[in-house]
Amino acid sequence: MSSSTQIRPIAVVGPTASGKTAISLELAKLLDGEVVNIDSMQLYRGMDIGTAKVPPEERQGIPHHQLDIWPVTKPASVAEYRSGAIATVEEILSRGKMPIIVGGSMMYIQALVDEWDFPPTDPIVREKWQRELDVRGVAAMHQYLATIDPEAARIIEDNDPRRTVRALEVIELTGKPFAASQPPKNSTPRWNMRLLGLSAPAEWLNPRIEQRVRQMFDQGLVEEVRSLVADGLARTSTAGQAIGYAQVLDYFAGELTFEEAVDRTITGTRRYARRQRSWFRRDKRIIWIDANSPDPVRAATEALGIVSQQ
């Protein structure tokens, strides 16, 4: 790649456990690329096992960016991520390299791909809604959200306290439905980026999710969470609400048995994968390949019109 103006970054998206990491590594090797993470929980330092973060020794010498940049005590910020990720991609392009953007965090991907004026924030308003949720519970607050903004309630899971609070905050601050503040879909992507999606039907993906979750617990997820608690991880933090981490924290609190924590992590991950499939399917710019194809890397290169030089 001799000129950054000729390079169209590639984003590899799709549900969790569909094989995005493996394909991104192969594409990076094929295209002289560097990987840019767009998984919101992989931004946190120390959250390795439960986020399926690629260990340094398995990165095959390929530079990885936007990993391990936040402490677990920091509230997540899509706007802050976008600013840093744009700078990272621009720097990679300036060196004539191919950015391979990979992950499944829907809002983060949307923010990087599309031009988006973020809705306002107000810590006082957010704290008000957070206190209300702490008293009434997430299910009741989600039900309230459904009465004032049915579309917001449709796209936000009824067990997602953070997004429920954020929607109520935005509605109060803007006086408009939450969806009105969401980014446009299907416009020309930033950098004329190519979007590659891994299609993974539930009957194929669900066993992979269970296998991955059980492997995470076998590899030491409980010990990882225990060490992060010493660093300030708490159930009230963004990081502490991550699937797997929240369940282990409940296990520590005596609210779940070990096996219940495992089972709820599996269930929560499957629900999240359903949301991801639904979200990405609405984006008509995505080029889809079968995650279960005999040679997904070849399918990816053919779908993207990439001719191997090897």
From Swiss-Prot:
Keyword tRNA processing in annotation: yes
Asked if the record carries the keyword Magnesium, the reply is yes
Q: How does it assemble?
A: Monomer.
For site (Interaction with substrate tRNA), what residue positions does UniProt give?
105, 126
Which UniProt keyword terms apply here? ATP-binding, Magnesium, Nucleotide-binding, Transferase, tRNA processing
Binding-site residues for substrate, renumbered to this chain? 16-21
Q: What is this protein called?
A: tRNA dimethylallyltransferase
The record's region (Interaction with substrate tRNA) falls at 39-42
- Please name the GO terms of the biological process aspect recorded for this protein, alphabetically: tRNA modification
Q: Which GO terms describe its molecular function?
A: ATP binding; tRNA dimethylallyltransferase activity
> Required cofactors, per record?
Mg(2+)
What NCBIfam families is this protein classified in?
miaA
